[in-house]
């Protein structure tokens, strides 16, 4: 996934647009002719993913995007963000999906073995990308996802401000809402594609005014993993968890 000229566009060869329930406000991610998800290769079944935030140069790479990744320190320094702020925005992005569906994220004990890596691009390009590595599930409708990477361009300016960026002083530069972009890219890693130009968090048109998952986003993630066991699947507003 790439953000360019105000729009989010898929920047990959193999991530094809899947024609799955677009009329319901979501589209499932199709790879090699199969929809993809974590956990059991069956719709409506939950999953748990370990994650790690990359701290420095990494040998890990994606199969299409995020081919060279590194730690987020340069990104934080350029945007004037602390590690605590970054962790809070990431927790809020995870929380959007956890509050809607039976999906759970937990810190990996061994970062090298994490299911999902959060990193910066070592060769900065675009704004943000997601990479998904599928594992064959024996000809079923779904292929299981084996690995995911989200990588952000450290040369862009990132904001951890609560609420839309409207009214924020702009000094000849464009800021991207870290929480929004992380949540969007995580949505790809979970198995969702772009359903439409606008209106959903997973839509490809960037909108810093969205405050959480929209009805189509929720319908899509629930179709993949079932509803959250803790909360009802209703549109939610992401909370700022920094400092907790």
Residue ranges and their predicted role:
Residues 19-244:
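Zinc-dependent metalloendopeptidases
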């Amino acid at each position: 996934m790439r953000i360019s000229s105000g729009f989010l566009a898929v920047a990959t060869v193999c991530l094809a647009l899947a024609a799955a329930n677009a009329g319901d406000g979501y589209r499932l991610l199709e790879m090699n002719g199969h929809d993809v998800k974590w956990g059991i290769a069956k719709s409506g079944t939950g999953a748990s993913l370990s994650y790690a935030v990359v701290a420095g140069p990494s040998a890990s790479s994606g199969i299409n995007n995020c081919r060279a990744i590194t730690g987020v320190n340069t990104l934080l320094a350029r945007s004037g963000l602390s590690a605590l702020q970054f962790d809070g925005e990431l927790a809020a992005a995870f929380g959007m999906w956890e509050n809607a569906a039976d999906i759970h994220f937990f810190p990996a004990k061994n970062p090298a073995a994490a299911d999902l890596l959060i990193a910066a691009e070592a060769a900065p390009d675009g704004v943000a990308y997601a990479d998904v590595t599928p594992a064959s599930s024996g000809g079923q409708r779904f292929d299981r996802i084996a690995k995911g990477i989200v990588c952000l361009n450290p040369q862009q300016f990132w904001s951890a401000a609560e609420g839309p960026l409207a009214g924020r002083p702009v000094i000849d530069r464009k800021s991207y809402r870290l929480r929004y972009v992380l949540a969007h890219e995580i949505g790809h890693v979970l198995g969702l594609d772009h359903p439409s130009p606008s209106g959903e968090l997973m839509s490809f048109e960037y909108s810093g005014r969205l405050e959480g998952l929209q009805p189509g986003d929720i319908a899509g993630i629930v179709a993949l993993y079932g509803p959250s066991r803790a909360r009802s699947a209703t549109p939610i507003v992401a909370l700022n968890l920094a400092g907790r």
